[in-house]
Each structure stands twice: as structure tokens, then as C-alpha cells.
């Protein structure tokens, strides 16, 4: 096995979570709604083809189909049971196009898509520059990319608690905002704008948090993870370390950092160049972190 992530494990985890996902993905739905609102960047433009990468159960795809009924909305996911859930939501008189596929190798023609939308999918891919380059290639000139992904402060409390129990990695190394911005620039996207939120969810205990993660398919997919069950001793040590963070409401907090990115595929006009390098601005300095609490 090569690479940081076990892609087979990721596919299997999300396949198993297909039936429980929507009931438990409260945060994912909130982020999805915020990303959908960012489609206003299109102004009066009406997209003909929209690609939803990592579409899951198809909620966002259906929302975009409702907004632009004449557009072809393609829901792409690597977990077939997720697409089966999306098919149940899709209206027979104006259906989605459902495609089983991977964000790393988009099964669409070059310059054929007006909008690529991807909600909380790309943190499972280690080579963001290559993936973004594939997105740019699929977009028509001037096409829009809107995506969200988890940042490095996601599950930081759980990461630290596990670290006190053993030295085996349990949480993925999520990309930072500068890394996302650099990846967009390397892929030659224009005018990238990034933002972020820091959400705090709360749980009764560690077991409740772990059940919630399994229900949305967010399990440890690292290649170097321990493949045997976590022993009672290690789990107890992790739980004890986490207990020190219990808040005034007698709940355990769990941080989720979300990075949002908006960028445009180049038009036929060349980008600004300086010293033989293409220049793009990324306004990431002084971006506020908005803290939101939900339980």
C-alpha cells in the first residue's frame, strides 16, 4: 500500500455510513448550506453543467438542481451506497446524473463543467495541487470552484487525548489554509479567496463522539493506523485524558475547523506575470475565526 490514506478503507467507511449519514451529519449540513450560499458569486450567470464532487447522499446536488432546473447536475461519489441514497432523493422528472468515481480522476471531459462544488471531501486526498489541477482542467474558462474541507484544528482535543494513550496516529493530518491557497495557485486558479470557521460540537462522553464519527464515515483511514481494535486500556487512557476538558455544561468539546475556498478557472486572457511567474492574490491575512457552539 502506498500513500498517506487507505482509499479502500475510506470507500468502505462511507459506504457503511450511507444510511446513518444524514441523521448525524449536522455540521456537514451547516457547512454545505454556507457553501451553497457562495454560489451567489456567479451573479446572473446560469451554469449549464455542475459537478458535485463527493456528493454523498445528494443534498447539495438536489439544492443546485432546484436552483437551476435546466442545468445538468452531476453527483460524483466513490461510495456506491451514498449514490443509491442520492438516487432516492432525485426526482424522476428532473433527475440528477449519478456517477461512481473519484475526485482524483474526474470522469468528465476537459473544459466541460461550469461549476465544481465539493463539500468536506478533499481532506481525504493528500495531493491537493494535483486534484485542483484536475478540477481546473475540467472547468470551462472562467468556471467556478467552490469547496470546503477540514483544517488542522479539527478534532484537536481527540488527537491530543489519543497521543497521551499511545504513539500510533489516530487522526488524519488535515491541510492548513496556506496549504490550500498554495495548491490553488499551483493549479493556476485565479483570484482564490479563502475563509474559515471554527465550530465546537459537544458530546456526553468519548464513546458518544466515536459513535458519531463512525455514523458519518469519519474513521481512521491512515495507512499506518493500527488495524486491530483499540484495547480497553488505551481507550480508557484516552477517555481519561479527554475528561480533563469537560466544560461547565458537563460536556466534552470537539473542535472542527472548516476551510472554504472559492477560485476561478483562467479565462483566455493571461494571468498577471512578474519575473516570469504567474501572480494570484490570496487574502488570507487577518481572516477571523468564528466560533459556533452546537450540541
UniProtKB/Swiss-Prot annotation:
The keyword Transferase applies. Keywords: Biotin biosynthesis, Methyltransferase, S-adenosyl-L-methionine, Transferase. Converts the free carboxyl group of a malonyl-thioester to its methyl ester by transfer of a methyl group from S-adenosyl-L-methionine (SAM). It allows to synthesize pimeloyl-ACP via the fatty acid synthetic pathway. InterPro entries: BioC (IPR011814), Malonyl-ACP_OMT (IPR050602), Methyltransf_11 (IPR013216), SAM-dependent_MTases_sf (IPR029063). It comes from the Bacteria. One of its GO terms (molecular function) is S-adenosylmethionine-dependent methyltransferase activity. Pathway: Cofactor biosynthesis; biotin biosynthesis. Belongs to the methyltransferase superfamily. Pfam families: Methyltransf_11 (PF08241). It catalyses: malonyl-[ACP] + S-adenosyl-L-methionine = malonyl-[ACP] methyl ester + S-adenosyl-L-homocysteine. One of its GO terms (biological process) is methylation. The keyword Hydrolase does not apply. This is Malonyl-[acyl-carrier protein] O-methyltransferase. SUPFAM superfamilies: S-adenosyl-L-methionine-dependent methyltransferases. PANTHER family: ARGININE-HYDROXYLASE NDUFAF5, MITOCHONDRIAL. Coiled coil: none annotated. It comes from Xylella fastidiosa (strain M23). Its EC number is 2.1.1.197.
Amino acid at each position: 500500500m502506498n500513500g498517506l490514506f487507505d482509499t479502500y478503507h475510506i470507500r468502505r467507511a462511507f459506504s457503511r455510513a450511507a444510511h446513518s449519514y444524514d441523521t448525524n451529519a449536522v455540521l456537514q449540513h451547516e457547512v454545505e448550506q454556507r457553501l451553497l450560499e457562495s454560489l451567489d458569486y456567479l451573479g446572473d450567470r446560469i451554469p449549464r453543467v455542475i459537478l458535485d464532487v463527493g456528493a454523498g447522499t445528494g443534498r447539495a446536488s438536489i439544492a443546485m438542481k432546484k436552483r437551476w432546473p435546466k442545468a445538468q447536475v452531476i453527483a460524483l461519489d466513490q461510495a456506491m451506497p451514498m449514490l443509491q441514497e442520492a438516487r432516492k432523493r432525485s426526482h424522476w422528472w428532473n433527475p440528477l446524473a449519478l456517477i461512481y468515481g473519484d475526485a482524483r480522476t474526474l470522469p468528465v471531459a476537459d473544459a466541460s463543467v461550469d461549476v465544481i462544488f465539493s463539500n468536506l471531501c478533499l481532506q481525504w486526498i493528500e495531493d491537493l495541487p494535483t486534484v485542483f489541477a484536475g478540477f481546473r482542467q475540467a472547468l470551462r474558462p472562467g468556471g467556478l470552484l467552490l469547496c470546503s474541507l477540514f483544517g488542522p484544528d479539527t478534532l484537536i482535543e481527540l488527537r491530543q487525548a489519543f497521543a497521551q494513550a499511545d504513539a500510533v496516529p489516530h487522526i488524519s493530518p488535515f491541510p492548513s489554509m496556506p496549504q490550500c491557497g498554495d495548491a490553488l495557485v499551483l493549479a493556476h486558479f485565479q483570484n482564490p479567496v479563502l475563509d474559515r470557521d471554527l465550530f465546537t460540537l459537544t458530546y456526553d462522553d468519548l464513546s458518544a463522539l466515536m459513535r458519531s464519527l463512525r455514523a458519518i464515515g469519519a474513521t481512521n483511514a491512515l495507512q499506518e493506523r493500527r488495524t486491530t481494535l483499540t484495547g480497553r486500556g488505551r481507550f480508557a487512557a484516552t477517555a481519561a485524558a479527554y475528561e480533563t476538558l469537560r466544560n461547565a455544561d458537563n460536556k466534552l468539546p470537539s473542535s472542527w475547523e472548516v476551510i472554504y475556498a472559492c477560485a476561478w478557472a483562467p479565462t483566455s486572457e493571461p494571468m498577471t506575470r512578474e519575473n516570469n511567474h504567474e501572480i494570484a492574490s490570496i487574502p488570507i491575512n487577518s481572516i477571523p475565526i468564528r466560533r459556533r457552539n452546537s450540541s
